[in-house]
């Protein structure tokens, strides 16, 4: 059993703290938001993540998981302190380290014995050195700084943490290495590796992984757009190239772009990190540009269908989160489509299983929010699908057709088979495939 402090209870911090408590560790989570801390003390999970609530409740009741706003109190008995703080993009797109370095500065004044400080946030290369320097400025005791990037997928974060395909640990300290290896042993019993490396390599590993996945998605979106021009079928192309082990089947599904808290921010931050070191990531610059335009790639199709006049048209929209199984709407393609549609005079009626409250907080009553997916369809001139939630994959098409004013679907996630849509009498257009005319 280790005594652990987690500073920051956002998405990464709360999953990290809860999962470490689940393996028998004593965890104190620290956050400056007193209202949030009070809610968590009372058993309220502030984010939506499948299965997190079960682990949270169990460990809160077992007193293995606790919360405080007091940093000194939170770290007092901890052997290991995780920093899970936001690194928002600055004005130039580079990662803003003020929260991490601010806490590091405070820690330097508070340390009374040896501790391992672990950077769990996604940070530019060289951040561990800056954290070490900020702590060392005030500290009178030994400490080590470790880079331990997270590789959690929203919607699968608990499973990803409990059964990681690898654990990356960046440290030059044998003492810290042994402590961290012992901490993570219960999570890699099936033989997946704990990969030790230097701090800078660990920091870059996280950025490189996200940038590669963003590039793979964007490449496939460009192939899909080209398929439409030449009459090829992106589904066939996807299967053809994905069967090659060197390429693999994952992250080859075309759509209306990536969003979320990681890919957009991390690709931009890596590009900026390159510029700071007189290096230009030309591929990643293109990835950002293509993804930005991909988010509204369906809008011209919608506009053309309605002959340039969307004023007063009622558009049902399924899916607001940037991906299924999360309530995260950061950089969600749906928001870009809403802006384009409402800007053209359309009335949008949206439904999402988890993200509607978050969207309300951002855009308020610019759109109408439906009670369920079918309620959104009433008298709709068209349906737009932006997120591939499971409940949208197999709807009652007869009911869909009866509710809508016209049987028209614009599918940004390629959920349905063209032949089936043709049989059912829908006008159906998607990404990288031929349009099904009624």
Predicted regions and their residues:
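Structural/interface elements that position substrates and couple domains in central-metabolism enzymes
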Residues: 1-438
């Amino acid at each position: 059993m280790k005594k652990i402090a987690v500073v920051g209870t956002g998405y990464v911090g709360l999953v990290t703290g809860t999962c470490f408590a689940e393996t028998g560790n004593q965890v104190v989570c620290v956050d400056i938001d007193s209202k949030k801390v009070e809610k968590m003390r009372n058993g309220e999970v502030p984010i939506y993540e499948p299965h997190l609530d079960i682990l949270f409740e169990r460990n809160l009741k077992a007193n293995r998981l606790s919360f405080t706003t007091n940093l000194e109190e939170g770290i007092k008995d901890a052997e290991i302190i995780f920093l899970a703080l936001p690194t928002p993009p600055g004005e130039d797109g580079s990662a803003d380290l003020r929260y991490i370095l601010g806490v590091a500065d405070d820690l330097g004044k508070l340390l009374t014995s040896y501790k391992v400080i672990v950077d769990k946030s996604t940070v530019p290369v060289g951040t561990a050195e800056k954290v070490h320097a900020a702590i060392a400025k005030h500290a009178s005791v030994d400490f080590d700084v470790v880079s331990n990037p997270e590789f959690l997928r929203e919607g699968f974060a608990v499973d990803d943490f409990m059964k990681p395909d690898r654990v990356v640990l960046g440290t030059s300290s044998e003492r810290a290495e042994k402590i961290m290896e012992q901490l993570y042993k219960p999570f890699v019993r099936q033989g997946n590796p704990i990969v030790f490396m230097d701090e800078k390599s660990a920091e870059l590993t996280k950025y490189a992984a996200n940038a590669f996945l963003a590039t793979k998605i964007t490449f496939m979106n460009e192939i899909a757009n080209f398929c439409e021009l030449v009459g090829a079928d992106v589904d066939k192309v996807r299967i053809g190239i994905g069967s090659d082990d060197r390429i693999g089947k994952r992250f080859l599904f075309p759509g209306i772009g990536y969003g979320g808290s990681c890919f957009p921010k991390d690709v931009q931050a890596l590009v900026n990190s390159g510029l700071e070191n007189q290096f230009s990531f030309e591929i990643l610059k293109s990835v950002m540009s293509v993804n930005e335009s991909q988010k509204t790639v369906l809008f011209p199709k919608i506009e053309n269908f309605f002959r340039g006049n969307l004023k007063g048209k009622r558009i049902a929209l399924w899916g607001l989160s940037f991906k299924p199984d999360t309530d995260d709407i950061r950089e969600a393609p749906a928001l870009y489509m809403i802006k384009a549609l409402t800007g053209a005079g359309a009335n949008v009626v949206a439904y999402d299983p988890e993200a509607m409250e978050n969207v309300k907080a951002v855009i308020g009553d610019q759109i109408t929010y439906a009670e369920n997916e079918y309620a959104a369809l009433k008298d709709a001139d068209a349906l737009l699908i932006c997120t591939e939630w499971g409940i949208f994959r197999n709807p009652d098409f007869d009911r869909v057709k009866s509710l809508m004013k016209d049987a028209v679907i614009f599918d940004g996630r390629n959920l349905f088979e063209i032949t089936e849509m043709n049989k059912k009498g829908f006008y159906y257009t998607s990404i990288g495939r031929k349009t099904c005319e009624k």
